[in-house]
């Protein structure tokens, strides 16, 4: 079989600070008013009163969605979305394009390595540049799958289970339980600047949900980098009587010694997890060495599917789980092939968590949602990632090459 070459790469954005607000899509923080994801949630900025109530107040949604499309010389296209917005468009169109165009559609690892090395001097340890690179990598996998007529999970070696089971992240674990999810992860609302009173309030929330959900439904806390070791340790022990399954991302990404100490001091049986905002393979190797229980890379932020597969191997070698941060189809096709991913995350993007809404709505067409907390592998059997780009969205292409 003679495979085509890549003829064009294009980058659009939607939403963010230079477009319409509340566009949703790949930047799932870019939601409208009265949404749980922008309510009073603890963040590293919560210590400043003017930025405590709303995450959008400090600019969590300024980037917007990046859309990368790659076109082969036979006319077939692949695409992906992530969070990088207009700045990501510049990086793709003015820098990364030279490593993509003219390559065979199967040259994914070569392109990935060239992009990584070419951006080392300004990429740092992740962030915007890595989000952009990840989006390109995912678009390449989508194109390759569509060219050969196979879903991405089969390109990775095939499924190791018949279905993916999910826990739900959102403000209402009790509603997630009614929908058939195996657990519910809530955001914390208070942090070290609130002292013991903050701990008592978050513990009261956990206790209330435990009473509503019964003794066996999983409950977890997402702390979103907002704590220090002492506060996180006190919170974990205060929640232990309510059978908290894990405490997540208590510390900023680079505080590896802090994660090691938190794991050492955590209550017996309670897992410590992190990784959503780590952005390189090397950072995940170091994170793994802290002994945490679950690593949680975001496939749209960590280097793409190519890097996610490598992260899963690091975790597997140490007997750790890898449960990616919710990334819809981009993580579905990966985790169904990982033996150390027994469940996955579904992010509730409906404002009140009362209905199931596709995570990247409205940018993806055909994006599946769990049924009774599960997605069967047959749902993933379309070529590539199995979704199409909604070109009715307000897509802007600010740069061309």
From Swiss-Prot:
EC number of the protein: 4.2.1.90
Catalytic residue list: 325
Signal sequence range: none
Gene this chain is encoded by: rhmD
Organism in which the protein naturally occurs: Klebsiella pneumoniae (strain 342)
Sites where the protein binds substrate: 29, 55, 345
GO molecular-function terms, A-Z: L-rhamnonate dehydratase activity; magnesium ion binding
Record's catalysed reaction(s): L-rhamnonate = 2-dehydro-3-deoxy-L-rhamnonate + H2O
Note: Reaction proceeds via a syn dehydration.
Subunit note: Homooctamer; tetramer of dimers.
Residues annotated to bind Mg(2+): 222, 248, 276
Name of this chain's protein: L-rhamnonate dehydratase
Transmembrane spans: none
